[in-house]
Swiss-Prot record:
Quaternary structure (record): Interacts with sup-12; in the presence of RNA, but with weak affinity in the absence of RNA.
Gene: asd-2
Protein name according to UniProt: RNA-binding protein asd-2
Compartmental location: Nucleus
Domain note: The KH domain and the Qua2 region are involved in RNA binding.
CDD domains: KH-I_HOW
Location, primary (coarse class): nucleus
Site (Involved in RNA binding): 145, 168, 172, 238, 241
Protein task: RNA-binding protein that binds to the 5'-NACUAAY-N(1,20)-UAAY-3' consensus sequence in pre-mRNA introns to promote alternative splicing. Required for mutually exclusive alternative splicing where it modulates the switch between mutually exclusive exons during pre-mRNA maturation. Involved in muscle-specific gene expression regulating the alternative splicing of genes such as let-2 and unc-60 to ensure that their respective isoforms are expressed in muscle.
Ranges for domain KH: 145-171
Phenotype upon loss of function: Defective alternative splicing of the unc-60 gene which results in decreased expression of the muscle-specific isoform of unc-60. Double knockout with isoform c of unc-60 rescues the motility and actin filament disorganization defects in the single unc-60 isoform c mutant. RNAi-mediated knockdown results animals that are viable throughout embryonic and larval development, and furthermore, results in defective alternative splicing of the let-2 gene, whereby transcripts containing exon 10 are not formed in larvae and so the muscle-specific isoform of let-2 is not expressed in body wall muscles.
Keywords: mRNA processing, mRNA splicing, Nucleus, RNA-binding
Amino acid sequence: MDCDNGVVSEISDDKELLNLETVIPPPPNDSGHEFIGPSSGPPQVTITPSGVQSGSANGVSTSQQQQYSAEYLSQLLKDKKQLAAFPNVFHHLERLADEEINKVRVVLFQCEFSKESAPLPDAEGDSTVHTEKVFVPAKEHPDYNFVGRILGPRGMTAKQLEQETGCKIMVRGRGSMRDKKKEELNRGKPNWEHLSEELHVLIQCEDTENRAKVKLMRAVEEVRKLLVPAPEGEDDLKRKQLMELAIINGTYRSGTDQSALAAAQLAAVKHQQQPFAAALQAAALQRGVLPMMANGLSRSPTMAVCGAPIVMSPSGRASSAGATATSQAALIMQQQSQLHAANAGNAALQQQAALLQQQQAAEYQQLLLSQAGLYDFSAMQQQYAAVGQNAAVAAAQAQAQAQYGALAAAAAANSAGNQQYADYAGVDLTSQQSAHGGYYVRRWA
């Protein structure tokens, strides 16, 4: 860049990556005094997305402010959530996303607090903690949400107020906790004495006494502005807070999304109404009236939901069209009557088939019962025969055992006598049966 007699000529390279605007102070005036601009430092250069630079006090150009929108902030938050799935991977992307989110949020949702801050005096003395209480008019406005208005979504409004005033903003007192049960349990305990007081905003400032008074005065003034209820529908701060909360929660819908949703709902309603319109058209045909879309008829602009359309004045071709519609209606009625007759015949055939099936089932059950009785009688006879055979076998076994016992006893008697007889005659004196399986007693002569 060459400068000659206050004339600046810009020399850009072949790539033309960046163009810089340099503010040249005007020449000295007639009085000989040099003009001093608003700031003695170097000019601030802000690079816009289009490559145009413009100075700005807060580092955000006018073109950027026009481009920022709630949809853009919602997209940035979604991108940040996607980056969170890869922790410690895209360090620069996370930092750039956070910076852009903060910048857009400041432009869109920054509360318009008073920018005229009183100059702070020089520090005198030691730093101490100074507090102020601003009571909330909850009794005058019991249905107004003062706590949410002061804190904002995720405490963003209170944080912004803390940054601008240099004080700490806290909501204390009865009704300051979201969990009412926990509030009742903690009331009266140490470090929870504020729950016994009325709802108020506690402002703390840690600084020297002379500087803390200035900070507290400004903070009290801004808090009192927030405690003035705005009319319904005219609260711009509440609108911004609700929009920011919806964006944070991911439930924000832009105007484009809402119009698309409305179009989808309308299409669904039309799709559901198509069967109803077809039913109305069929009813009109059955009554011998032309359908709604038939040519050659002029109807009233409004028509009842149910019933036939009102024919106001048929044209010249109405007679031929009416005859055609009548013949079509008669044909449809004939087809419907034939269909009903066929359905009735099918129903009668089905009833007859069902009766035949029931009769066959009853006969089959009777046959099964009779066969089951025969099978049971023969089985009983077989069981009785088996029992008789078992009894006969048992009696034969008992008789054989008795005979074997008698023979054994006779053999024992013969061996015990140990006498030899030349000839003898056996005479049966008595025959006694002493018990079951008894034996005969013989006397030897």
